[in-house]
């Protein structure tokens, strides 16, 4: 198992690299750049914001930094030891009720698939057992051009930047013996899965109804944008259904939310979360299920649908014009 190695490598990426031998953090902070990185179940993302596009030196440095993250991270033993202590403290701080809840419901969210036991940060024992060689091997195995993507967003000349991306990143050699990346499958369940979480530190009583859906395979740009717009429209319209109950003072819950978003690679998730009034757990559940079923069978009112589209367009229009 390589649990925790992707997250460990994310930490290493902010230490020494080929073009930033004194550390990436020093450069980013000295130039007041906003940066972030996150490792999830399927991928690691690095992000730098507020890069002044009029400053050619800054943009050139960021291109080299992105290239270094792809292929030029220096994995030094002294940095491994330092980051192991930092990650270990991160692990200890994460051992709270929210973490216990996440781990408890994972077998039901992912139906006992490999995702159910996947531990992004790893165990404390694993964190301190990994060596520079282990991390370097992981880096060489999985940080390959065909598994990477570079996105540059801003007021730029696309043709020039595309040329630079091809020049800089095209120099990264392909792996001679690439390991196949296998996508874990989440099996269908014949009946709904149920889990009740009880914890002495859990002070709120909440309920979640989650439904997995297969995502589009090899989506086009149009597919991705279309799905995002549909998800936002669905969330807006479904939320209005919940709001109507509150306006009529007929709701059996304190608060309720609905969302449609990516779950893991190849799967999306429709989630209904609500906090019922004390003693109204079953009534609230029946009420949410009734709304969910009505939407599934009848859809939305055509007038409300057009109003939602117009409202979403008006929200997005300033962004498109800026």
What do the PLM-derived regions correspond to, one by one?
Residues 149-207, 303, 310, 314-320:
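An aromatic/glycine/proline-enriched structural segment found at the starts
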Residues 17-18, 51-53, 92, 153-157, ...:
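Solvent-exposed coil/turn segments that connect beta secondary-structure elements
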Residues 1-5, 23, 30, 41-45, ...:
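Extracytoplasmic
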Residues 1-52, 96-101, 117-123, 233-268:
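M16/MPP (pitrilysin/insulinase) zinc-metallopeptidase core fold and M16-derived inactive scaffolds
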Residues 49, 56, 107-148, 158, ...:
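Histidine-acidic residue clusters that define the catalytic metal-binding segment
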Residues 16, 48-83, 245, 261-321:
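M16/insulysin-pitrilysin zinc metalloprotease superfamily fold
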Residues 177-242, 273, 322:
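His/Glu-based metal-binding/catalytic segments typifying zinc-dependent metallopeptidases
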């Amino acid at each position: 198992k390589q649990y925790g190695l992707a997250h460990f490598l994310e930490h290493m990426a902010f230490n020494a690299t080929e073009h930033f031998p004194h550390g990436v953090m020093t450069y980013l902070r000295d130039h007041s750049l906003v940066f972030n990185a996150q490792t999830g179940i399927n991928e690691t993302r690095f992000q730098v914001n507020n890069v002044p596009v009029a400053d050619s030196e800054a943009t050139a440095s960021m291109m080299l930094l992105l290239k270094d993250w792809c292929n030029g991270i220096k994995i030094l033993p002294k940095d491994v030891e330092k980051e192991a202590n930092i990650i270990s403290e991160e692990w200890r701080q994460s051992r709270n009720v929210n973490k216990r809840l996440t781990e408890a419901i994972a077998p039901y969210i992912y139906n006992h698939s490999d995702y159910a036991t996947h531990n992004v940060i790893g165990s404390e024992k694993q964190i301190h057992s990994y060596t520079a060689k282990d991390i370097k091997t992981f880096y060489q195995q999985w940080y390959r051009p065909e598994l990477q993507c570079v996105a540059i967003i801003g007021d730029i000349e696309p043709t020039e930047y595309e040329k630079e991306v091809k020049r800089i990143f095209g120099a990264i050699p392909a792996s001679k013996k690439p390991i196949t990346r296998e996508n874990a499958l989440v099996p269908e369940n014949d009946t709904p899965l149920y889990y009740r979480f009880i914890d002495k530190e859990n002070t709120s009583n909440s309920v979640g109804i989650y439904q997995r859906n297969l995502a589009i395979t090899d989506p086009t740009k149009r597919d991705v944008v279309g799905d995002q717009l549909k998800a936002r429209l669905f969330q807006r319209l479904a939320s209005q259904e919940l709001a109507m109950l509150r306006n009529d003072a007929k709701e059996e819950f304190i608060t309720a939310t609905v969302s449609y978003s990516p779950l893991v690679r190849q799967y999306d998730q429709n989630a209904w979360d609500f906090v019922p009034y004390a003693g109204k757990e079953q009534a609230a559940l029946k009420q949410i299920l009734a709304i969910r079923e009505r939407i599934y069978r009848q859809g939305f009112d055509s007038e409300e649908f057009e109003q939602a589209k117009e409202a979403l367009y008006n929200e997005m229009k300033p962004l498109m014009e800026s």
